[in-house]
């Protein structure tokens, strides 16, 4: 937060936390309390926090992220009243949960949406592929978000700089076909 203020970054992406198999409720509460403290401090510094919806891990994984599904993410937003805590919508994370991209977006809409993170996958596991290498319908996603009047920014979340350049060009071509 201090570095963001110093370099005038204006926002910091944050995660709700993680849990192990037996400590879900305790970790969920600890994550919320940490985000509240961070929100208070960030507000005083003039920095916005963006809570990212995370990816689910396989059921047999030792560690699981928090804020992976609509219910968990809603818990955090309902209990984080700070106007300076927005949403970083990671589309490829939503693509691997049952409600999908549209269902996850519709649960929250534009109210807190500040950033849309873009990568592709095939909907079956956590991947950050170059757009066009998976099966996300980016035209449908852009139409859904842009038709609502989104005024935030998009961010590429995959690969190296060359991958991002190629992915950006793919997405621009997709936008031209809308």
Tell where the protein language model's regions lie, with residue ranges.
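Active-site-proximal beta-alpha loop/turn segments in soluble metabolic enzymes
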Residues: 16-24, 53-63
């Amino acid at each position: 937060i201090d570095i963001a203020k110093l370099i005038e970054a204006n926002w910091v992406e944050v995660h709700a936390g993680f849990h192990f198999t037996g400590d879900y409720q305790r970790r969920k509460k600890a994550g919320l309390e940490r985000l509240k403290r961070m929100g208070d401090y960030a507000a005083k510094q003039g920095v916005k926090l963006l809570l990212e919806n995370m990816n689910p891990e396989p059921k047999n994984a030792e560690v699981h992220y928090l804020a992976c599904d609509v219910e968990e993410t809603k818990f955090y937003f309902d209990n984080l009243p700070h106007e300076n805590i927005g949403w970083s919508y990671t589309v490829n994370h939503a693509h691997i949960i049952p409600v999908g991209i549209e269902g996850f977006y519709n649960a929250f809409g534009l109210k807190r949406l500040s950033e849309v993170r873009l990568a592709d996958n095939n909907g079956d596991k956590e991947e950050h592929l170059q757009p066009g290498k998976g099966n996300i319908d980016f035209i449908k996603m852009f139409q859904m978000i842009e038709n609502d009047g989104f005024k935030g920014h998009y961010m590429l979340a995959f690969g190296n700089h060359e991958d991002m350049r190629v992915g950006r060009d793919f997405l621009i071509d997709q936008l031209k076909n809308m």
